[in-house]
Amino acid sequence: MLPYSACIVKHFLPSRLYIFAQTLPFPRVLPYNRHMEFKYFKNMLVISGVKPFDLEKCCTCGQAFRWVKNPVHMQAGLFGECGLNDAEASPAFTGVIRGRAVLVMQSDDSLIVTPCAKGEAQLFIDYFDLKRDYSAVEAALAADERLRVCLPGSSGIRVFNQEPFEALISFIISANNN
């Protein structure tokens, strides 16, 4: 039986690349992040324990085109309300998740999503694929010499669980991007 990732690429990659994908050292069952916690503050959701995660890399890597980088002053004060450190904050991004406009910010290993009502955490955890333990996936990729060189520049990127139409349009745009 092929590893999970090889089964996915089987339908999308040319035969030579598919043969290479079969040799990748991905785990058969992708591990889950057991260190993640979330809390609500007013109309904000704070998700902590989401390493490795780099919001800026995720939103600008070309997998989604509905994310806009905001000036740093827009997030001033929000981190203090949640008990987080402004100094470790990355830029904030405005985007659309399942038809909802949201502002997302990161401080160290915490992610802040606003606006968010109580009970909506699962929507954002699923979209950003925060349940998956990407450090275990990166460790499996590091076992391959060819992929090890790519890890420093791509560490922290997570695959967004976009709506199918959004993923299709993002793929078409990135394929036609010069």
List where the protein language model places each region.
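HhH-family (HhH-GPD) DNA N-glycosylase catalytic core used in base-excision repair
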Residues: 19, 29-178
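Short terminal hydrophobic/aromatic SLiMs and anchors at protein ends
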Residues: 1-20, 24, 32-35
